[in-house]
Amino acid sequence: MSFIEKEDKAVFEAIQNEYNRQNNNIELIASENFVSEAVMEAQGSVLTNKYAEGYPGRRYYGGCQYVDITETLAIERAKELFGAEHVNVQPHSGSQANMAVYLVALDHGDTVLGMNLSHGGHLTHGSPVNFSGKFYNFVEYGVDKETERIDYEEVRRLAKENKPKLIVAGASAYPREIDFKKFKEIADEVGAKLMVDMAHIAGLVAAGLHQNPVDYADFVTTTTHKTLRGPRGGMILTKEEYAKQIDKTIFPGIQGGPLEHVIAAKAVAFGEALNPDFKDYQEQVVKNAKALADTLIEEGFRVVSGGTDNHLVAVDVKGSFGITGKEAEEALDEVGITCNKNTIPFDQEKPFVTSGLRLGTPAATTRGFEEADFEEVAKIISLVVQNPKDEAKLKEASDRVAALTSKHPLYK
């Protein structure tokens, strides 16, 4: 009997049910992954008891000699992974990492260039419902209507017209590789600083499969979960000249005590990412995404931009089969495929309805799924999306999902 089961049966039951859901469903949410048992053990360790305001060697509390070790390990491993001059591993989330950069690089009301949310950007890149859109004057760039890829000439034109103080590159639902070198050239042309939010592709960058934004940007932010396969949290990588400003802005600026148990889990995850097999994993993530995209196209789906270069596939289900993203998400959930509705470029549907789905391969790849498995996943998706009310077809789909998940159990 576990300690939780003994002390709190209601919480224990919810956790068990969530484990069963993760084990029995195929996880296709692009921002999710499955951490190792070592990462989970670090996050559930006695470090959760320790307050440690400040930074290694400069704390406001005593007894920090061991959390100093784990935090320093996280910092040094992140530096090695990405070739960064300075790293802050204390942000509790990607949003807080982004907020810290804005507070360093901008004044209230300054102009910023960021990617349109429905074209693949992120809430913190200037959405009017987010602090970023409320505090700063964001000008949006997007993708070309024909190619559905970032229109770098539009970015250049908007930069010259609006003279932003900061340009934000990075996305949450963009399936193509981003040219950070080109963004840097545009930023230099207008005297802007460049921030890259690599939250979704950090694992691909660490493995050397995508351009490393650290080589070009003044500030790089990321989450530590998603493709990086660590605990839920954030991180900032920057040049030495901004180190003191960034550190002061995180603490005492917008956070108090760091979550040292999470930082230890980050250190473990970064250690895993430094192993050679991490590159093999990331290569498989991309191969699986391509197999998923290609098979969906064969099944009659319109895939945004015609394919993928990374870990995700954006699909126009409304344009393909007349079903909304919301309806498709719900139908797929019924048969054990977890994904999320998502706006696609130039979407006419509301954000809670959408015309699209965002499908990601990192989590299932961690379980051992390969190309043939994702070809089968695509065919199951096709069966469900084209027959969302057919009970016999849904039963068939559910059985096929069960066959895949039993073949690749979670936490064997």
UniProtKB/Swiss-Prot annotation:
CDD domains: SHMT (cd00378)
Catalyses which reaction(s): (6R)-5,10-methylene-5,6,7,8-tetrahydrofolate + glycine + H2O = (6S)-5,6,7,8-tetrahydrofolate + L-serine
GO MF entry, a single one: pyridoxal phosphate binding
One BP annotation, GO: tetrahydrofolate interconversion
Residues found modified as N6-(pyridoxal phosphate)lysine: K226
Main location: cytoplasm
Co-factor requirement: pyridoxal 5'-phosphate
InterPro entries membership: PyrdxlP-dep_Trfase, PyrdxlP-dep_Trfase_major, PyrdxlP-dep_Trfase_small, Ser_HO-MeTrfase, Ser_HO-MeTrfase-like, Ser_HO-MeTrfase_PLP_BS, SHMT-like_dom
Site (Plays an important role in substrate specificity): residue numbering on this chain: H225
Protein name per Swiss-Prot or TrEMBL: Serine hydroxymethyltransferase
